[in-house]
Amino acid sequence: MQVKENKQLCLISLGCSKNLVDSEVMLGKLYNYTLTNDAKSADVILINTCGFIESAKQESIQTILNAAKDKKEGAILIASGCLSERYKDEIKELIPEVDIFTGVGDYDKIDILIAKKQNQFSEQVFLSEHYNARIITGSSVHAYVKISEGCNQKCSFCAIPSFKGKLQSRELDSILKEVENLALKGYKDMTFIAQDSSSFLYDKGQKDGLIQLIKAIDKQQALKSARILYLYPSSTTLELIGAIESSPIFQNYFDMPIQHISDSMLKKMRRNSSQAHHLKLLDAMKQVKESFIRSTIIVGHPEENEGEFEELSAFLDEFRFDRLNIFAFSAEENTHAYSLEKVPKKTINARIKALNKIALKHQNHSFKALLNKPIKALVEHKEGEYFYKARDLRWAPEVDGEILINDSELATPLQPGHYTIVPSVFKDNILLAKVLSPF
């Protein structure tokens, strides 16, 4: 029997869903603590940091400083994850308020580090396996599954390989065991994630690893629905798009950050791809029935000129992504682009403002296209007193949108799970829907 310690833990997980998986592994090691959202009452405050771009670093630092100010006497403050790893040589002096620093290699040893009250930075980047117990957060029906760590790409702007290392794929059997274990606990919807999902198993000499994963999950039949995030253009193929389209489990969801469309900019960004390849993949994705396409672009990369920006702008307006992340270039140490001549911030801000208008126009069109027709959805939990929170089954959690179902229109309370619903109203970036039936 698991016995709870009479101690409280406040976990703050910053950054991406990949970070969240590592946070859930740490929760698994600290199962005997009582969880609290109140840092002031916690005996242990654990902040899993993000160190991706400047804004993320500032958020991590501010969160640490706020926790240091709020923590009670005797409480332990821990900073783990990417920011700690990236700046491990200087961070102890820069933020002396922290009691324990650890990076990206020791998530499964967090209980030992707390007991010994010691710092640790293992060289090997940690990759969660099926035998690492996780406490899933935020949902009783959805879980993330990390299929690899690190990245072999050499993008000019990205510092991630400098602290997350080379591509390190899990064995397919380990992933299948984790999926089975989670499905037995009721998690029937999963999102598969990595730094570069489409390169899964490249490090083991296999070029169709993600296709094999899709086929294995289909054959296993443990899940009702799934999707894949973070496809990289140069390792994404028409065959992979076809495998997703043919799958009864994987949704027709395509998340492929293109970063730019101009050939000259793709070369400057060292993306190892071309406009022609992007267009071939994107057109194939659009041909898939009821496909949902998300992408990411960077505005103001060094040497981006007006002509290249106009080319990008015209393409985005013509293609009409369902969702689009727009980032301002962030100059990061240990990257090729760091020392290149910068585009003025004023120019970057003006370009982002113009692209945001385009992105919002097409996003709203994507939402409105769902009105007054049956769609498959996942109901996750009660949101406030009167509504259930749901999402289109194609959507990734948190980032793609929100659907609310009014409980006053229901004969009986809803259990989390899969339902056919009909959205009827789109207002304030939210869809309101009625439930037809479970499936």
Swiss-Prot record:
Keyword Cytoplasm in the entry? The reply is: yes
One family from Pfam that matches here is Radical_SAM
**UniProt xrefs under CDD domains:** Radical_SAM
Q: Which cofactor does it need?
A: [4Fe-4S] cluster
Chain residues that bind [4Fe-4S] cluster 1: 16, 50, 82
Keyword list, A-Z:
4Fe-4S, Cytoplasm, Iron, Iron-sulfur, Metal-binding, S-adenosyl-L-methionine, Transferase
Per UniProt, the cofactor note for this protein states: Binds 2 [4Fe-4S] clusters. One cluster is coordinated with 3 cysteines and an exchangeable S-adenosyl-L-methionine.
Q: Does the keyword Signal apply?
A: no
Q: Which reaction does this chain catalyze?
A: L-aspartate(89)-[ribosomal protein uS12]-hydrogen + (sulfur carrier)-SH + AH2 + 2 S-adenosyl-L-methionine = 3-methylsulfanyl-L-aspartate(89)-[ribosomal protein uS12]-hydrogen + (sulfur carrier)-H + 5'-deoxyadenosine + L-methionine + A + S-adenosyl-L-homocysteine + 2 H(+)
Which purpose does this protein serve, as stated in its record? Catalyzes the methylthiolation of an aspartic acid residue of ribosomal protein uS12.
Regarding protein family, the annotation reads: Belongs to the methylthiotransferase family. RimO subfamily.
Identify the NCBIfam families for this entry: 30S ribosomal protein S12 methylthiotransferase RimO (TIGR01125), MiaB/RimO family radical SAM methylthiotransferase (TIGR00089)
Instruction: Name it.
Output: Ribosomal protein uS12 methylthiotransferase RimO
- The species this protein belongs to is Helicobacter pylori (strain HPAG1)
Q: Which gene encodes it?
A: rimO
